[in-house]
From Swiss-Prot:
Signal peptide: none annotated. The gene is ALDO2. This is Fructose-bisphosphate aldolase 2. Its EC number is 4.1.2.13. Keywords: Cytoplasm, Glycolysis, Host cell membrane, Host membrane, Lyase, Membrane, Schiff base. Dihydroxyacetone phosphate binds at residues 40, 152, 237, 279-280, 309-310. It is a peripheral membrane protein. It comes from Plasmodium berghei (strain Anka). Plays a key role in glycolysis by catalyzing the cleavage of fructose 1,6-bisphosphate into dihydroxyacetone phosphate and glyceraldehyde 3-phosphate.
Length: 369
């Protein structure tokens, strides 16, 4: 007779106290009405942002800008966590206050970008793999000591039906890399945000995006399972299901809501606490409206919220212009945008926050950061 011993052909379980901490942190990150501020732009990417407002990309200016963001009073009402670039995790403002302390003052959980960028996958037509697994465990330990409680790793795929993209090889590579990263993070008490971004590049229809996104997410969750990742202590950061940027058919926001929700229901286990969408180059306003269209289709088995970078910061940067006298106005803009997205998580955003400038597209082809 077969006894009740545990099945041995399975990954080792996390210690109970670690699993509990991860699950609690993940739930806090997707608390009702809150989302995540993605402020993890690399030094090269923030240079592009600063070039647009004609300020120099110096350590001091980067610290001043992050101080503007994190020092916004009341931000914690709408923002649960902030993803930081490594430099920012250890940085101080002009007054000598660590920037992470500003987040703590608002009850915002610090997180950290841990991937090391993209490289081409051999034997593919420039499809990408993400670097950064080497030494990740040691880095996670240091990030945890510095106050980080979650991490983010971005993988990228492109849709090109004529070239068969994404190939099965690239989907497999992306899925396995995300799963290994997630497992390493959890072993070191960091909640992993799993980001398989399908870029908006291309002229494909929304139906094609739905098919590809479904295939990718199914592969990702299979890999997470195979690597013993605790779903209750992880979050997913996917693209919304939209048509390609160059598609001639204008996509309605209701269709984005329908196809996105259908795709998630077909692929994402309810054990996962939440999904934090990336904005993917949508305008600030579109990112809020489309998130609203997703949430009006609830109730859902997971929290569906936001993890926006450009869609929270574009108008803030344009208002700030690198000038101290504009900091208060820029912070007011950030609060307005954060509140709009908070309302969208309830399906109660009516549109109009930020005026006409919030409708400007933030799309960048082959976006890297």
């Amino acid at each position: 007779m077969v006894g009740c011993a545990e099945y041995k052909n399975a990954p080792m379980k996390l210690p109970k106290e670690v699993a509990q901490e991860l699950a609690e942190t993940a739930k806090k990150l997707v608390a009702a009405g809150k989302g995540i501020l993605a402020a993890d732009e690399s030094t090269q990417t923030i240079k592009k942002r600063f070039d647009n407002i004609k300020i120099e990309n110096t350590v001091e200016n980067r610290a001043s800008y992050r101080d503007l963001l994190f020092g916004t009073k009341g931000l914690g009402k709408f923002i649960s966590g902030a993803i930081l670039f490594e430099e920012t995790l250890f940085q101080k403002n002009e007054a000598g206050v660590p920037l992470v302390n500003l987040l703590h003052d608002e009850g915002i959980i610090p997180g950290i970008k841990v991937d090391k960028g993209l490289v081409s996958i051999p034997c593919t037509d420039d499809e990408k793999s993400t670097q950064g697994l080497d030494g990740l465990a040691e880095r996670c330990k240091e990030y945890y000591k510095a106050g980080a409680r979650f991490a983010k790793w971005r993988a990228v795929l492109v849709i090109d039906p004529a070239k068969g993209k994404p190939t099965d090889l690239s989907i497999q590579e992306v899925s396995w890399g995300l799963a290994r990263y997630a497992s390493i993070c959890q072993q070191n008490k960091l909640v992993p945000i799993v980001e398989p971004e399908i870029l908006a590049d291309g002229a494909h229809t929304i139906e094609v995006c739905a098919t590809v996104t479904q295939k990718v997410l199914a592969s990702v969750f299979k890999a997470l399972h195979d690597n013993g990742v605790l779903l209750e202590g992880a979050l997913l950061k996917p693209n919304m299901v939209t048509a390609g940027y160059d598609c001639t058919e204008k996509t309605k926001t209701d269709d984005i809501g329908f196809f996105t929700v259908r795709t998630l229901r077909r692929t994402v286990p309810p054990a996962l606490p939440g999904v934090v969408f990336l904005s993917g180059g949508q305008s600030e306003e579109d990112a809020s409206i489309n998130l609203n269209s997703i949430n009006v289709l609830g109730p859902h088995p997971w929290a569906l919220t936001f993890s926006y970078g450009r869609a929270l910061q574009a108008s803030v940067l344009n208002t700030w212009q690198g000038k101290k006298e504009n900091v208060a106005k820029a912070r007011a803009v950030l609060l307005q945008r954060a509140e709009a997205n908070s309302l969208a998580t309830y399906g109660k955003y009516k549109g109009g926050a930020g005026g006409s400038t919030a409708g400007a597209s933030l799309y960048e082809k082959k976006y890297v950061y």
